[in-house]
Amino acid sequence: METTVQKKRILSGIQPSGNLTLGSYLGAIKNWAALADEYDCYYMMADMHTITVRQVPADLRRNTLTQLAAYIASGLDPEKNVLFVQSHVPAHAQLGWVLDCYTMFGELSRMTQFKDKSAKNADNINAGLFTYPALMAGDILLYQADLVPVGGDQKQHVEICRDIANRFNGIYGETFKIPEPYIPTVGARVMSLTSPENKMSKSDKDPNGCVYMLEKPEDIMRKFKKAVTDSEACVRYDIANKPGVSNLMQIYAVSTGKTFEEIEAEFAGRGYGDFKKAVGESVVEMLRPIREETERLLADKAYLETIYRSGAERASRVADRTVSKVYKKVGFLAR
């Protein structure tokens, strides 16, 4: 009699706070599509986290649907992956509150993203912005995730999640699986085209610093032509001394499959103009089918609705079991 090997489970998500960036695609979504055969994958539109910063309601709804379409267009098969909207699974809020009560003030105070977002949103430093690591821990622990795909700058979130889970398990006995960060080696952190010392972000003050997944080809090319390099005029990977060129090399490597050595040889003796044009063209061609398929999917709202409704049902079956277990452990009276 054959025994079925239980797949390890992965949970990740992106806030639908605007257009998905090239950094989101190369650093996360592109890698997710290849994981479904090996892992049990759950991917969410993290809309509850999004409202820690004020949103225009109609834009949030549109961005959430567009993000779902982009997930599917990027190769996330809804049959193989559980795709869902965070707010459609009430267990996230339920577990998030319980974990708030097992998360220390000092832990939250040390979170670097709270400091960064507080500085950028000084007129709206709300409690949700402060406690969102506890909600994020709930997102992960609800599904008893083994692995959490994150960028190198997000390891702190997995670390506090592990601390919270270990604390809860220490008090009540084994309840949560302790997750590990899953960090891809290439494309894990795409930097701004205009400030390569900073991560590419939709909140970049210079609009030319960020490329979007669904952007028009001519706009993508324009941004790459303006990308910051240096005065050396030599395509060589050196992250410390040539951050702009190294960032472009990393983008080109991921979009073409070429090694850094092959890229250096390809552009030996050629100027940065040729190099930036080639990087831009490779990104345009990589994103073209995704943009076209996203547009096609957005024209079929009924199909997308079936996907997010089914995803919420599948996610809730797992999440509700965890919440029931946690409620019993902390002493809540069963309904």
Where would I find each of the regions flagged by the language model?
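Short, histidine-centered active-site or binding-site loop motifs used for metal coordination
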Residues: I14-P16, D47-H49, D146-L147, D204, ...
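Short, polar/flexible loop-turn hinges at active-site or ligand-entry regions and domain interfaces
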Residues: V56-P57, V148-G151, V235
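Short catalytic-loop micro-motif centered on adjacent basic/acidic residues
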Residues: V82-V85, P149, E232
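Short helix-capping/linker segments at secondary-structure and domain boundaries
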Residues: F105-S109, L142-P149, A253-I263
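Internal, conserved structured core segments that host functional sites
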Residues: D116-F168, Y172, S192
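Conserved nucleotide- and phosphate/pyrophosphate-binding catalytic cores
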Residues: Q156, R162-R335
